């Protein structure tokens, strides 16, 4: 997914679950006190699935605002039903912000539908650039 988004000119500004590449989360501050950097890293990262939906939605809102994100790609692996519960809440928030979302449910590893994913994301990016 990261390769597809990057090849299409997108930039990933947040990954909201605790699997995958942590490189997309906030970095540990290396120029400050090491303990302070670690504390900030764990306090300000995306909350795990153990917090309320409202808090998770607000964290997504803050990330979108802070990064000036123009779209959201929701990519859920097979059997990742917990994350799908927050979709209606995230969708409502994004509608208010006029931010488009594209969602992919039940995705396999490795990705078995890369062409469809690439086409859908490419279409979204084209629409963001004013294309039809």
Enumerate the predicted regions with their spans.
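Redox- and metal-dependent alpha/beta enzyme cores, enriched for Fe-S-associated oxidoreductases
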Residues: 1-52, 56-59
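Hydrophobic/aromatic beta-strand patches that form the interior of the parallel beta-sheet core
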Residues: 13, 72-73, 102
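Peripheral docking tails and interdomain loops at the edges
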Residues: 88-132
């Amino acid at each position: 997914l990261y390769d597809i988004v990057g090849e299409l000119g997108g930039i990933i500004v947040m990954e909201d679950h605790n699997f995958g590449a942590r490189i997309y989360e906030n970095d540990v501050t290396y120029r400050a006190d090491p303990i302070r950097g670690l504390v900030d890293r764990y306090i300000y990262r995306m909350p795990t699935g153990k917090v309320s939906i409202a808090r998770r939605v607000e964290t997504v809102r803050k990330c979108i605002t802070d990064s000036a994100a123009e779209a959201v790609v929701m990519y859920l692996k097979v059997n990742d039903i917990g994350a799908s519960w927050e979709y209606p809440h995230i969708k409502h928030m994004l509608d208010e912000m006029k931010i488009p979302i594209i969602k992919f449910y039940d995705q396999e590893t490795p990705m078995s539908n890369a062409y469809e994913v690439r086409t859908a994301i490419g279409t979204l990016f084209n629409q963001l650039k004013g294309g039809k």
